[in-house]
Amino acid sequence: MADPSQASFWAQANALLRKNLTYQRRHIWTNIRLVLVPLLLCLFLLGIQLLLDVVVNKAADLTKCGSQDDFSIGDCPIPNPPLLPPLLQIPEPESRAVSGGFFSYNDLPDKSCRKTGTCPVTILLTGNNHSLGQALSGNMFGGSFAVNSSDLLSSLAYNVLGSTLALGTNNYADPGIESDFPIYSIQSQCSPNSTWPLSFGKIHTAVTCLQGLSLWRNNSVEVNDELFKGNWKGNPERMTNEIAAAYDLLNTDRNNFDVTIWYNSTNIDDPSRAPLVRVPRLLNLVSNAYLKFLKGPGTRILFEFVKEVPKHQTKFNLDIASMLGPLFFTWVVLLLFPVILTSLVYEKQERLRIIMKMHGLGIGPYWMISYAYFLTLSMFYVISLVIFGSAIGLRYFRLNDYSVQFIFYFIFVNLQISFAFLASSIFSKVKTATVVAYTLVFASGLLGMFLFGELLESPTFPEKGILALELYPGFSLFRGLYEFAQYASRGNGMKWKDLKESGMDKLFYLMSVEWFVILIVAYSIDLLSSSGRSPFVFFKKSSSLPSPSVQRQNSENVLIDMEKTDVTQEREKVEKLRKEGTTGHAIVCDNLKKVYPGSDGNPPKLAVRGLYLDVPSGECFGMLGPNGAGKTSFINMMTGLLKPTSGTALVQGLDICKDMNKVYTSMGVCPQHDLLWGTLTGREHLLFYGRLKNIKGSALMQAVEESLKSVSLFDGGVADKPAGKYSGGMKRRLSVAISLIGNPKVVYMDEPSTGLDPASRKDLWTVIQRAKQNTAIILTTHSMEEAEFLCDRLGIFVDGGLQCVGNPKELKGRYGGSYVFTMTTSVEHEEKVERMVKHISPNSKRVYHLAGTQKFEIPKQEVMIADVFFMVEKVKSKFTVFAWGLADTTLEDVFFKVATTAQAFNSLS
């Protein structure tokens, strides 16, 4: 096998990219189905649109066309639109300008007129010539109302008529004439009960006199101030004081007519419908006043009527995509969020991210490749949505500028991906992440439609509040889709010039800034998590670990005093190596300690108590210990998952606290549970991890082939079968092969032969024995047979401390200086058996007895094996012996003895 070296950023990225491409190729139909989701949803919308068109066309009653109601039927042809008298737009009676409060002008009427509904309508004038303004002011309104029924439109043109009702989107009908609301005749003075009947074709209504005031202001600043304060948003009392119109005569004189008109356009309820505004009559009014000033009262321009252009018969067109687009397409685009989030959480839940990190994959290449994949998938998805929607003729997509749509979707999908990376730091289970993600998707659409959409249309909700709500990506998406729908319904769609008017420019800026901020925060949190620190470390109260109690300090002093000779020698060897250098020593642990902070009133947990350990290259060191002894914490520190509380360890001379990324290049890990991709083959797994070890070209192929052969996964096409179809034993062998690919200098194996049959276990042990020739291996196991077969030295861990170190024979000789004698008889003969054992070995100790079966430890120096056989024959002559046995001390006995002794001592201390 080729020796590994540190893979560069691009080598790691290349390895992950190749693995991901292979993985996605195996899931090609899943990806195709995902990209086709927009097509299916667009077809669904098209089906609803076609069905709705059929229903509406059947329901449309075109038989009334040509009747008296034909102008109110939008589908009817109108070859001869009606002639309508032009009206002024005047404020409602309760909103007309009055004096008092925030208005400092005394020429306005008293606010008591609002109680009787008699407040006049006010028009403001300003300019550079006050006397001219006063003259024009007197010429604005007539003094009486008179009509000639034989020439109604011409006679009405001599009067100044107005209405409080706004126009619609066309001039086929005027609500001010056809409704039950009064038409006003604006005059300089009104007599009491001045009302006149008026018949306009088949419409019968009444005209009511309304006083008109023309008031002078010194300059346009005063006019602007008065108009602004007259709007309810412009004054602290939230009161409406509406001026009908205002004129700035500028430099107007007898030789020059130059005027600017202020008019009210804030009564537009639905901007998408683009209603007409009654401006022409305002212009005619001031023009006639100027002509009277120049030529006398008999001179005027008669503005007799307004008339819409003729139209053909049209069909009622209800654009369902524009109506439901914001809700529907919010759901469609947000469906990517659960896909991205669950993919990220899955790698965390299955610990695939961790195992890749342990084999040398840095956080930078992982983020770059993963982000690029999600971005590519997202852009394919939204581009498919736009293409499919345009292809089937949805105006929602066809009318809005494609470049505007592209930029909007590009910014949003980047924001969504960043948000998914951030959210993935919260979840550890795919099911939880899936439920929360889909809940957010549907809640975002519904809240966007029925809450956020209402706030967008509300004139009272502040813009800052809208921007604050748009900080949530779901609402920012809804806002953009809402604006697309509004502009598409107008018939012209959104262009780049419309960004400022619609507020999309601010939305683009907000999403872009939020994208980068969330991306940086998510990356920082992931960086902290990968270093073994809590991602929420900044939100925790800063505090140092509490110092141990006096009792705990005394206990540790006693432990040092009671330290076994072999453990002391190991510590002294490490201290000497640190002084002289560690050349040739693969692993050197120097006072490595891990303390978990206490919580809920509990004291800190000392998981690893100042470990000293030297493992040279070519040695397999076995770690034995009961559950909770600290083995996992030790391995996690050595593999970079946890930061040591104090002390350190050197791996090939590299400090795990400072150079962990370099350590990964020479490290292999075989975890307790197989961390594999079910759809990747054994060969593809090894190719990926080989590339992470910076093995290239033919050397990579050779290393993969040798690894597969060494664990019996090469022949019979097994190497090219998906790992998901492997048996448990085959997966275990593949995990061992992964840990050994690239000839790493240090390998950590956690119960490598778990789940294997005896034959496979022996083969695997042979592989590990061959691998350790140039490698330092630390192996944890509960199998004493495995430890005795593989390990050159063993260490027994109890309560975070190393209790003994040595090769298996030394430990059995040191802690097992006795034979184990077992005999099974009837219960009534138990005492006789015990007396006979005591007879040949006074210092023997019974360690077990149950239902006639007894086990004794007999010191070797007190008895010969022949004495035991002689005693058994003597016993058999006196009563029945069902079974008996004599055995030397096993490694399991040593482990049990050391562990129970240490635990008993620690509990007493």
Swiss-Prot record:
Residues with PTM Phosphoserine: S555
Gene3D superfamilies to which the protein is assigned, alphabetical: P-loop containing nucleotide triphosphate hydrolases (3.40.50.300)
Residues that span the membrane, as ranges: 35-55, 320-340, 374-394, 406-426, 433-453, 465-485, 507-527
Residue positions binding ATP: G625, P626, N627, G628, A629, G630, K631, T632
Pfam families assigned to the protein according to its UniProt record, in alphabetical order: ABC2_membrane_3, ABC_tran, ABCA12_C
Protein topology in the membrane: Multi-pass membrane protein
Domain ABC transporter: 587-824
GO cellular component: membrane
Protein's cellular compartments: Membrane
Keyword Iron-sulfur: no
Keywords: ATP-binding, Membrane, Nucleotide-binding, Phosphoprotein, Transmembrane, Transmembrane helix, Transport
A GO molecular-function descriptor: ATP binding
Keyword flag Phosphoprotein: yes
PANTHER family, alphabetized: ABC TRANSPORTER A FAMILY MEMBER 10, ATP-BINDING CASSETTE TRANSPORTER SUBFAMILY A ABCA
UniProt family annotation: Belongs to the ABC transporter superfamily. ABCA family. CPR flippase (TC 3.A.1.211) subfamily.
Protein name: ABC transporter A family member 10
